[in-house]
């Protein structure tokens, strides 16, 4: 993936900036990112808010789906949670392209805790692929 596109997406996605997401790897149809669970991400029972995990997975989805250079926008997404994440834990999200046609793409994101790869959540998403390319 063009490094200019990665930089553009990293710098201009305000939620990814707020989450302080680190981009570890991006290649065509794949991304791997990380973030540390902070206190302002916790819900009332002191576990990471599901919306923060969803947004984290969604950014991995955005990177992988836009890695071909054409603008791809999410049209459907779903997440299932298995284990909680706690304050100070590092989360890793890996996104894999499971299929892509001229206009649509399907992606799977796995979120886990880095220290032991304990599974946290599974996210699936679909994109609509526009004709427009990134101009950065």
Q: What is the meaning of each model-derived region?
A:
Residues 1-17:
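Extreme N-terminal tail/first-helix region
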